[in-house]
Amino acid sequence: MQKNVREIAVLMQDKEKEYKICEKLRRQPELSGLKILCREQLQSLGPSETFNKRLKRLEPLAGRVLLTDLRDTELPEVVKNIPSIGYGFDYRGSAKYVVENTDSIDKMYLETVYCRYYRLPLEIAETDRLILREMQLTDLDSLYEVYDTLRDCPYIEPLYERAEEEEFTRQYIKNMYGFFEHGLWLVIRKEDNKVIGRAGIENREIDGELQKELGYLIGKPWQGKGYAAEACLAILDYVKERELCSHLFLCCHQKNIPSISLAQKLGFTVYAEDIDGMNLYVCSIN
């Protein structure tokens, strides 16, 4: 899995509170392997300016995330340009991510904060053969190659023309990944880093309510090898772990037998049939 974050720097108004938070983070099994540093530890390395000298080395992609309850004006200048998480219900800073306690902080959460700040594609899941990650504009050539192998498939809508697809992708990254924290992700074969498809979670209005829908496609040369099932099982685990929803839907053409077979294998059951030639399936997440 993606391992950008290596260190959490904790800065709190109250030193005792800061120490307790650091100790709690160190005891959380899901954060094992990460360095947890508070102001006192850094200052003990030398004179008072040691802390700021250390922070000046916090360069982009250095692997640090700041957890703080300080206002922006109270932060040392050099930590205003690293990924930050606000702490406490009364936090008044500008961090886009805020937690009331440390229970929700795990490595995936830290990676999300880090990647959003530096506009990096977030890795969602890793299986024996695959990596699922968010796409970026530089992936478009690979995506066009995948869709070109499916040009004769009646169930797949083609991509837009290049300029329009680039703009669509920019907005998708900003609004789906950035706001909803899910979307369609790239399916990448680990052995050669080849993009072989897409799979992920989209939004769909069903019976007047916004629901989560599983979607997937694998390029023709890589079909029949179990890649779709492997990717979808990883997504179901991700949805369960992140508690994204209690039910997940899936929509496919009623004549798309391989897709129907996969849906049933994944535990989906019929929710509605023959809606303009499409079947709707549902799966309980528990």
Where are these regions (language model features)?
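Asp-based, Mg2+/Mn2+-dependent phosphohydrolase catalytic module
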Residues: 1-125
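GNAT-family acyltransferases
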Residues: 1-11, 24-32, 100-221, 234-238, ...
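Conserved SAM-binding loop
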Residues: 66-68, 132, 252
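Glycine-rich acyl-CoA binding loop
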Residues: 224-229
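Conserved beta-strand-loop-alpha-helix junction that forms the acyl-donor binding cleft
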Residues: 249-260
